[in-house]
Amino acid sequence: MVNFGWRSAFLVFGALSLLWLWPWARVLRRQRQEIRRVADGAVEVPSPPMSLLLQCRAMWGTALGLFSSNYTFYFMMAWLPLYLVRERGFSVDDMAKLASASYVVMAVCALLAGWAIDRYIRSGGSANRGYKVIMAAAHGGAVLCMLGMAFGSQPLALASIFVYQALTGASSPGVYAIPEILGGTRATGRWVGIQNSLGNLAGIAAPWLTGFLIDQTGHFTVAFLVAAAMSLLGLVGWLGMLPKLEELDWEARALAAVPTAP
């Protein structure tokens, strides 16, 4: 952007995204073949209806948890550049390097966390404990990071950015593994679909609300406080609203949902 303008950034990243098509198509072709082989010998089991999922407290818990995670994610993605330039005095070039490096940290931590939790479970650890500890650490840490960026010195604010990205990356495997465990093969697709539809409303709310708050106050402090509060909501969703992480008994839930005769 500094050397070639903002249009070049869209062109470059648009072209780079096309590189993903070839390996994705090859993997998809192999998966389709495997799915056909499994489906040929599988016994079809009906999925729970959408109405039953909407009555499930745990589904609303994961949706709230994802909304909370996504609020801070979209807040940072949309406003971190301006924050670094306007509030912390970085040049556009330095801002780009810092922001890019922080997302590299997020990606690496996502890979490491996925590997670590799988190894922990294979060695006899509890999926319930493992995933919930990670989600609690990520959301509790995000609260502290938002406060560090709002009120901290320059070094503390920069450290908070990188710690936040590391925690967000580490928690990302759980966002999809948890509904897979709870929903099982019968309900995972619908569960994740509802969860993502609700959770990604944060992508609408966070950029707009942040812009409104900055316009009204002239600084980022209140916006960071709101983001910290949203992170606390994630603790309610992931810890307060979820049962033990194991596949839910959909037959029992369906029977319980049937009204009894007067």
List each model region and its residues.
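Helix-loop-helix hairpin linking two adjacent transmembrane segments in secondary transporters
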Residues: 1-32
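Juxtamembrane intracellular "pre-TM" segments in multi-pass secondary transporters
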Residues: 31-63, 87, 259-261
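Juxtamembrane helix-start elements in MFS-like secondary transporters
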Residues: 91-99, 131, 157, 192
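A late C-terminal transmembrane helix in Major Facilitator Superfamily
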Residues: 110, 180-219
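Intrinsic disorder in cytosolic terminal tails and internal cytosolic loops
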Residues: 35-45, 125, 242-262
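Extracytoplasmic gate region of multi-pass secondary transporters
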Residues: 56-113, 168-176, 206
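C-terminal transmembrane helical hairpin of 12-TM major facilitator-type secondary transporters
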Residues: 128-175
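Interfacial helix-cap and linker-helix signal at transmembrane-aqueous boundaries
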Residues: 1-4, 84-85, 116-117, 121, ...
